[in-house]
Amino acid sequence: MNQYMKKKLVQHTAIATAIMMASSMLVISTAYAHEGRLYSIGDKDYWITVGSINEPVFVDDKSGAEAFISLADPSDPFNSDANGTKNIEGLEKTIKFEISAGDKKKELIVEPAWRDPGHYEATFYPTIETTYNYRLFGTINNVSVSLDYQCVPGGAQEGAQENVTKQISEGVTIKAQRGGFGCPASRADAGFPEPYVSNNELVSMIKELQKGQNSTK
C-alpha cells in the first residue's frame, strides 16, 4: 500500500470513528431525555421508555408521544442494554396513547416508527407551555395496561436508576425506573430575528381585538 492510500485510509478511519462517537452521544442523549421503566406484565418483563418526539420540544413544534418497548433479557432484566433484550413489534394493533393537559384529553393512534422495531409514535403539536401527561394503554402480553408518564417542567431529568417493586394493576408491576423528559417550552426566547408569538397567543390577541371593537360599537 503506497503512502497516499495509507493517508486516505487513516482519514476515513478517523471520520468513521467520529461518526460512531457522535451516534453514541445521540443515543445517550435520547435515552436521558425519556423516562424508562421496567415492568412485569403477565409472565414477562418489559422495558417501556416514553418521552416526546424531537426533544427538546417548543410550543407549536411537530412533536408527539413515543414509546420504545422491548422484552427484557431474562438473565439480566434490570439492564435495558443487555444482549438478550428484544424489541417488540406489532404493538400498534393493541396500544394507544392518551395525551392530556389540564382538563383536556385526546386519544392518539400509535404508529410504528420507520425501520425502528419496538419504536412507536403518536404525533401531535403542543399548543401551550404546560405539563403534559402521556398515558399508554391497551394490551401487552394479553394483559390490560394503563401506564402514566408525565413531562418534567424545566427540562429532562437524568438521575440514577431506581429499583422499586410496586403493583400498578392486575398483572402489572413496576420494578425499576429512571430518567424523565422535559415539557414543551416557550419559543419566546428562542425566536430570531423577531420574538416568536405562538398560535395560541395570536388567537388570544385576535379575541381581545374583537372584544375591544365590539365594546366601541
Positions of predicted regions on the chain:
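N-terminal soluble domains immediately following signal/targeting peptides that reside
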Residues: 30-216
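Bacterial N-terminal signal peptides that target proteins for export
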Residues: 2-17
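C-terminal segment of classical bacterial N-terminal signal peptides
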Residues: 21-30
